[in-house]
């Protein structure tokens, strides 16, 4: 199969279940809401080494937020429910509560499988001076702070989502591959319910489980040598075509299978429109580890 002249390999992305939270952060200005969202989703690329996977899903205009202020929806994700709650408390408590003019609301809504009492636990920062209230049809806590009051919804919904939807962009140069990756991330941003948790949404250093070198067996993950252009002609199992000199990976987490599949589709379409892109493929473990398999060609049927 070819799309816009780019070969789409007949393969699949292998993805995994993960617990997902969606939090709406609002503030007096878009600038401060973005700062809080950025801080709260830091160090959240992959649970291989990061304490959670996290990212900014989208901007929400004042006309669509509970308090009529600009906001951003973020996702914080973790395979373990208990650890997700811990990460929410740490990230919201340390990175949003501390940020000027912010408030936080549940953004999972009716999609939630369960509720976590994150706001209830955050309210103890108020040292007994906090107040329980109802605002905008939501049960909230008002925590007194130097900047006035910090508003947090009492409970936040979580659900079982999908982590690790992915595809690789192979291009004639590194620059072309990066331009295509940026185009893919921009397209994915229009899809609700998903995040691209790596820096700028792009993975430069794809990894494999463990190590090939027997001296490096202590490593949990090492470079995906099969996908390194500089090892083309060096390693016997290289998967880099002769005309490819740049590769980037896009990884997607989302609230459900359909959201992740739509994000993959839109990202691939955008990437194939960039001059110099030669091939789109995906990463998997032969179907042995992940619950979900997203066939690249089936995305376009």
From Swiss-Prot:
The protein's Enzyme Commission number: 2.3.1.101
Disulfide bond residue pairs: none
InterPro entries tied to this protein: ForMFR_H4MPT_ForTrfase, ForMFR_H4MPT_ForTrfase_C, ForMFR_H4MPT_ForTrfase_fd-like, ForMFR_H4MPT_ForTrfase_N
GO CC terms of this entry: cytoplasm
Species: Methanocaldococcus jannaschii (strain ATCC 43067 / DSM 2661 / JAL-1 / JCM 10045 / NBRC 100440) (Methanococcus jannaschii)
Enzymatic reactions: N-formylmethanofuran + 5,6,7,8-tetrahydromethanopterin + H(+) = N(5)-formyl-5,6,7,8-tetrahydromethanopterin + methanofuran
Chief location bin: cytoplasm
Domain of life according to the entry: Archaea
Protein name: Formylmethanofuran--tetrahydromethanopterin formyltransferase
Top-tier EC class: transferase
Subunit structure: Homotetramer.
Record-level GO BP terms: methanogenesis, from carbon dioxide; one-carbon metabolic process
Subcellular localization(s) per the UniProt record: Cytoplasm
Similarity section: Belongs to the FTR family.
Pathway(s) it belongs to: One-carbon metabolism; methanogenesis from CO(2); 5,10-methenyl-5,6,7,8-tetrahydromethanopterin from CO(2): step 2/3
Gene Ontology molecular function: formylmethanofuran-tetrahydromethanopterin N-formyltransferase activity
Keyword Glycoprotein: no
Function: Catalyzes the reversible transfer of a formyl group from formylmethanofuran (formyl-MFR) to tetrahydromethanopterin (H(4)MPT) to produce 5-formyl tetrahydromethanopterin (5-formyl-H(4)MPT) and methanofuran (MFR).
Gene (name only): ftr
Keyword field: Acyltransferase, Cytoplasm, Methanogenesis, One-carbon metabolism, Transferase
Pfam families: FTR, FTR_C
């Amino acid at each position: 199969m070819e799309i816009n002249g780019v070969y789409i390999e007949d393969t699949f992305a292998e993805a995994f279940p993960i617990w997902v939270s969606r939090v709406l952060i609002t503030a007096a200005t878009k600038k401060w809401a973005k700062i809080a969202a950025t801080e709260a989703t830091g160090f959240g690329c992959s649970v291989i080494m990061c304490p959670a996977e996290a990212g900014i899903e989208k901007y929400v205009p004042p006309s669509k937020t509970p308090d009529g202020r600009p906001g951003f929806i973020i996702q914080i994700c973790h395979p373990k429910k208990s650890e997700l709650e811990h990460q929410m408390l740490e990230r919201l408590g340390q990175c949003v509560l501390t940020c000027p003019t912010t408030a936080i609301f549940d953004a999972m809504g009716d999609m939630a499988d369960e509720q976590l009492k994150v706001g209830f636990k955050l309210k103890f920062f108020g040292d007994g001076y906090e107040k329980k209230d109802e605002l905008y049809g939501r049960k909230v806590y008002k925590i007194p702070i130097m900047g006035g009051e910090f508003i947090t919804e009492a409970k936040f919904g979580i659900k079982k989502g999908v982590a690790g939807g992915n595809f690789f962009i192979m291009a004639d140069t590194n620059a072309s591959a990066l331009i295509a990756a940026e185009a893919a991330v921009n397209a994915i941003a229009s899809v609700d319910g998903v995040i691209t948790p790596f820096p700028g949404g792009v993975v430069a250093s794809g990894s494999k489980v463990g190590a090939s070198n027997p001296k490096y067996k202590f490593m949990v993950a090492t470079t995906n040598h099969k996908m390194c252009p500089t090892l083309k002609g060096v390693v016997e199992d290289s998967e880099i075509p002769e005309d490819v000199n740049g590769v980037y990976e896009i990884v997607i987490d989302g609230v459900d299978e359909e959201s992740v599949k739509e994000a993959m589709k839109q990202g691939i379409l955008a990437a194939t429109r960039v001059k110099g892109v030669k091939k789109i493929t995906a990463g998997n473990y032969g179907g042995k580890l992940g619950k979900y398999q997203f066939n690249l060609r089936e995305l376009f049927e």
